[in-house]
Amino acid sequence: MRIGILGYGRFGRALASLLREAGHPHQAWDPTAEIPGECRAAGPEGLVAACEALVLAVPIPALAGALGQVRPFLRPEQLVFDVGSVKVGPCALLDAHLGAAIPHAGTHPLFGPVSLARAERPLRVVLCPSPLHPAAADRLESLFHSLGCEVLRQSPEDHDRVMATTHALTFFIAKGLLDVGAGAELPFTPPSFHAIAHTLESVQEDAGHLFAVLQNQNPFALGARVGLLEALSAIHQSLAEAVASGTEEQLAIPDLGTRSPVLQEARNHIDTLDQELVALLARRTELVLRAGRAKADMGLPIHDPERESAQLQARRAWAQEAGLDIQGVEDVFRAVLRASRAAQGK
């Protein structure tokens, strides 16, 4: 399928890389962004003329203007979709501008430039079909499957309700923590903060305009924020009351250890870590394949014994620093390297 990408910001570029890897020819147009010459369209009209499906990869506040810009050039056999993080408003705009004449649907890819660069998997997409064009949703689902994505169908309202209590609240909490200095360089942190620190890092790596969009464009975000603030206020007040009444134990967060034996808890954690290791190996394989394609473009051989030797030496040093069995860690990474060569067909 020939794809046109209107908007070549961080997500537009990331989507282009997925399309390239899947073998979908594509062009892009953006009035300000730098686009590789081989896929740069001459303008909006040329972009629309050359594609079978048009991706509106623009910020949500710019969506109405983008639709007005391309609408005169669209044809009934084409397919149009957006990729915004909010769906109620954008889906309504698609219906209003394109109506019954142009097939369309709303989508929200639950990944971005950072997760793609890290080769995080699985890739998931929420698809919001338009009642005017049920067949368009089927075409879009096939397209995303060809990119290696899992697809979940939701109404725009159901999507935004879930995003209000997950995506929007995550950014809201993260901004609060950053504003009180929790994201600054700290001399030490407990393990319980590590996941939060990762969240803060992820939020800071996202597009700067996304915070306001998630809070102000999602019709359910205000209610989610109010509910959270009320819950935090109640907890804050109950802390003082518990001290006065001597009932602080009632505020304790349920402890996993009180519900499962120590051995079972340890085994559960081991299983979870092993799942994470497998997911990391999948991500590593994706990066290895990406490196292999880059080598092929440069005319370099896939197998690089000198680099493998340096890798093993570095991993032995890491093992020593961590107090692990050096030979055991080397054996693990030799197996990883064998798997990498097998994935590359070498």
Regions found by a protein language model. Name each.
Residues 187-257:
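Interdomain hinge/lid region at the active-site interface
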